[in-house]
Amino acid sequence: MTENPYASPESPLYGGGTQAPAPKAPGLMEQIVGVFTEPTALFQKLRQAPSWVPAVVLFCVLAVAVTLVWGLKVDVDAMLRPMLERNPSVSAGQIDMIIDMQKKFILPFGLMGAVFFPWIGVLLMAFLYWLVGKGMAEGEAPSYTQSLSAASVPALVGLPHGLLIILMALLRPVGGLTPEKLPPTSVGFFLPAENPKLVAALFALDLFSLATWALSFLAFRHLLKLKPAGAVLATFLLVLFQAGFKILFAK
């Protein structure tokens, strides 16, 4: 028997049928659990329903906590004087003046950076991923919102690193160490070096940084659907911005 050609306006033929509900974006707790347990499945869900703001808000909260705990204990003189003394164009009097100024402003400016830099970093990296996706996606190019998810959610695997920094700053003298040098999670913690660029390279080889880069590669493949070469390029850009420039400009 043929179907009734006189379908009612409520029929799907007229667009009035029941439509499937839009996919629901994974919540923040689901994202945190997912990056440690089922990252591929998480990124596939985020492709259908991107989410990024809760992750960045959490990064800001953690960055503020790290800055407060570290900034109240750090010895600014011990942190800056060796670097300034290596610069022959800076006199002893100028060194003292710079250190005195930094002691006053390191905490307020650090807190401002903790609030704004996570947003700026995610927006910038997402734009670069979006550009890569325009030319190196396997099918449809990713949206900017999907790129924002890829730029933020994989970094949730680094949350324990921030908590370790806070714990180490509370339990031991900080001296002139910067936050990333406090927890025993990098090669630089176990292999001391004198050359500033080598020091930066060794501390860049951190367990949580490596995990973030690996998860980001998965996000590029499963969330943005980039070709393998595109995922490699996007991962290279991430490593360049997170580690390469630090090594290049280390003094």
Which positions does each model-derived feature cover?
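Short juxtamembrane and helix-loop transition motifs at transmembrane-helix boundaries
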Residues: P21-P23, G110, A193-V199
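Low-complexity, intrinsically disordered extramembrane tails and loops of integral membrane proteins
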Residues: M1-P26
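Selected alpha-helical membrane-embedding segments in polytopic membrane proteins
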Residues: L28, F36-P160
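Hydrophobic alpha-helical transmembrane segments and adjacent short intramembrane/lumenal linkers
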Residues: A141, T145-K251
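Residue-level detector of alpha-helix boundaries and kinks
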Residues: K24-A25, F117, L205
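Short, flexible segments with low predicted structural confidence
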Residues: G17, K103-K104, L191-P192
